Every structure is written in C-alpha cells, then in structure tokens.
Amino acid sequence: MKLNVIRLFDPWRSSLCTCPRKYSLHPYTGCSHFCLYCYATSYIGRKPSTPKVKFLERVKGDLEFIEKDAIIEMSSSSDPYPPIEEKVKLTRKTLELLLTRDVRVLITTKSHIVTRDIDLLRKIPSAIMITVTTLDDSLAKLIEPEAPPPSLRLKAIRELNMSNIPVGVRVDPIMPGVNDDPYLIAELIEVVKEAGARHIVTATYKAKWDSLSRLSQAIPEIAGKLRELYVHSGVKIHGYMYLTRNKREELLLPVVKTAIKLGLTVATCREGLNSQYFQAPSCDGSHLISLSPRSKININRS
C-alpha cells in the first residue's frame, strides 16, 4: 500500500519515539510561524506555509486505505493553522473529509485559529495539543516571531475546554538559558491547567546547526552556553545534538513534578528517560481522544 499524503508516523525510525501507531498529515509545506528552534528547517528550509497541490483529492484517495479508528495527526512538523488558513481553510476542509470516515484526529498547533473549527471537532473523536513554551508574550515574539502570542493560545485552551474538546499542552522545547527557569515553568503548568489542559508533553531542545545559529544570533548572551552544552558537552543522537542525559533530566523534572502535583498526565518526547518521566497512557496526548464526546475508543500506549 503506497500512501500519498497521509503517512505512517515514524520519526527518523527512532527507538526513542514512544508514540502509539498513528498517521501524520500536513496540509501545508513550510511553516509561517518561523520559530527559531524549528528542526524541520534543517531538511525543508525556512519557508512560509504553502498549501499542498491537489491536497484534498490526495487525502480522499489515501483514506480508502486507512484502517478504521486510525489516529491521524495534523501536524507534527508544519502547523495546520498558519495565518493563511484563515483564508484558504485547507485544514478545515480536511477535517470535513475526515468527518466522513471512522478515524480519530489529533491536532498539534500553536494557533488560536483552531477554535474556528470547534463545530467540526465536536463531531469527530479528537483532541488538541497546543504548544506553549512560555507565558511571556515578548519572549515568545523573539523565539516564535510569527506565531500567535501565548495569551491567545491560553484563550484557545479555555474555549476548547468549555466546548468539551479535550486539550493538552506541549511545553516543548525547553531551551537552556531561554525558558528553563523552574519557577516560571511551574507557573506555566499551573496556568494551562487552570485554562483546561489535561495533559502535558515536554521535551528539551534538540539542536541542528541552523536552529542553533538562529538562537545564538537572536539571543547572543546565551550563544556560548548553547555551544558548550550542545557542541562540546552534548551527545549526537540520530543526527541531532542532545544535551547530556543528566542535563535533560534536570530541565524536565520541574515540568513532570508540577504536572503530577496538579493531577495532570505528563510525558516526555524522544528523550529515552525512565518511567518517572512518563506518567501517561500516551506521550503525544492521543489518549485524550478517548475523553472526546464522540469517542468510544480507549487508546493505550503500545
């Protein structure tokens, strides 16, 4: 079976990936949010969001071969709700297609535009993961220059929760010297929990040369620290520069402890850490789909 635009999710064929079986679907190539830390730019370049050619037609063809109750995620690397989505509505039209099939939907986004589609999401077994790396709008503007500010993302979390659509938050990535203050992290978890988040996914920044250069240029006072931690002291895993295991545990533990204290499920993403850092049925938040009013399926970590 050869699929066209719906692809089995298999990041780098990595043993560190703990996601359940799912498919990824990207209505757009590139991403207009232009986050400095983006890993996808290392292989697709830094390009604005562009609708894929004949995308809906290709999705329709692929859906003929997708098994019942499959999880389809939009999107793992290119945000499904870039600014252009308000006009072209490609993601919305995709949801309308998915609504005609027995599939489950996981949406990962930084955009409040997702709330526009609440009417459709209430009809599909679905869950939403919204990325919030900081509560500071000015810091977010620096590291995620064209993404909606955290204040709008928090508003979206509240609106989704009030509409009974399960929502979680990705505190990802955590970057040394940028957004790693444990007190601010604890505050972030508390605020998103109050807004309605039920699950937290977290991960440390995995460096590529292009993203490392962007961060160093934007925040020159941390350039030396990043180079020391990633280039000199770090470890290479699947072509990415990782922090040492001890450093990753140090940065992620405040997230995990605060989430557990507040009664949230929590997991890390592609970190290879022990079970203390994985306190959830799934890492990606797909288990939240079982809480959707339209879902009768329980998702277990495989």
Label each residue range with its predicted role.
Residues 1-129, 133-138:
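Conserved Radical SAM active-site core
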Residues 2, 183-302:
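Auxiliary Fe-S-binding modules of radical SAM enzymes
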Residues 70-72, 105-107, 128-130, 167-171, ...:
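Hydrophobic faces of well-ordered beta-strands that scaffold small-molecule active sites
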Residues 73-82, 113-115, 128-147, 174-176, ...:
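Conserved radical SAM core fold
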Residues 88-90, 151, 182-188:
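Charged helix-capping and loop-helix junction motifs
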Residues 95-99, 122, 157-164, 256-260:
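Surface-exposed amphipathic alpha-helices with a cationic face
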Residues 107, 175-188:
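Active-site glycine- and acidic-residue-rich loops that bind
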Residues 146, 159-181, 238-243:
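Conserved strand-turn element in the central/C-terminal portion of the radical SAM core barrel
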